[in-house]
C-alpha cells in the first residue's frame, strides 16, 4: 500500500509542476484561453482527482 501512496504523491507533485509551468505559458500564448481551455480543464481535473486519491490513500497508511 505504501508503494501506491508514494506513487500517487509523486504523480501529484509531477502534475502540480506541469500545471505551474503550463498554465502561464498557455495563457500567454497568442490564442490564450480560447484555444487551451480544454487542456487546462483536463489538467486541473486530473490534479483534483490526484489530491483526493492521495487523501484516501493517506487514510489507509496512517
Curated annotation (Swiss-Prot):
GO terms for biological process: photosynthesis; photosystem II stabilization. It holds the Pfam family Ycf9. Belongs to the PsbZ family. It is found in: Plastid, Chloroplast thylakoid membrane. InterPro entries: PSII_PsbZ (IPR002644), PSII_PsbZ_sf (IPR036512). GO terms for cellular component: chloroplast thylakoid membrane; photosystem II reaction center. It comes from Cryptomeria japonica (Japanese cedar). This is Photosystem II reaction center protein Z. Keywords: Chloroplast, Membrane, Photosynthesis, Photosystem II, Plastid, Reaction center, Thylakoid, Transmembrane, Transmembrane helix. It is a multi-pass membrane protein. Its main location: plastid. Disulfide bonds: none annotated. PSII is composed of 1 copy each of membrane proteins PsbA, PsbB, PsbC, PsbD, PsbE, PsbF, PsbH, PsbI, PsbJ, PsbK, PsbL, PsbM, PsbT, PsbY, PsbZ, Psb30/Ycf12, at least 3 peripheral proteins of the oxygen-evolving complex and a large number of cofactors. It forms dimeric complexes. May control the interaction of photosystem II (PSII) cores with the light-harvesting antenna, regulates electron flow through the 2 photosystem reaction centers. PSII is a light-driven water plastoquinone oxidoreductase, using light energy to abstract electrons from H(2)O, generating a proton gradient subsequently used for ATP formation. The chain crosses the membrane at residues 8-28, 41-61.
Amino acid at each position: 500500500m505504501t508503494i501506491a501512496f508514494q506513487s500517487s504523491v509523486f504523480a501529484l507533485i509531477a502534475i502540480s509542476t506541469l500545471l505551474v509551468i503550463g498554465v502561464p505559458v498557455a495563457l500567454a500564448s497568442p490564442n490564450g484561453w480560447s484555444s487551451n481551455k480544454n487542456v487546462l480543464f483536463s489538467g486541473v481535473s486530473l490534479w483534483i482527482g490526484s489530491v483526493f486519491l492521495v487523501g484516501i490513500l493517506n487514510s489507509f497508511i496512517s
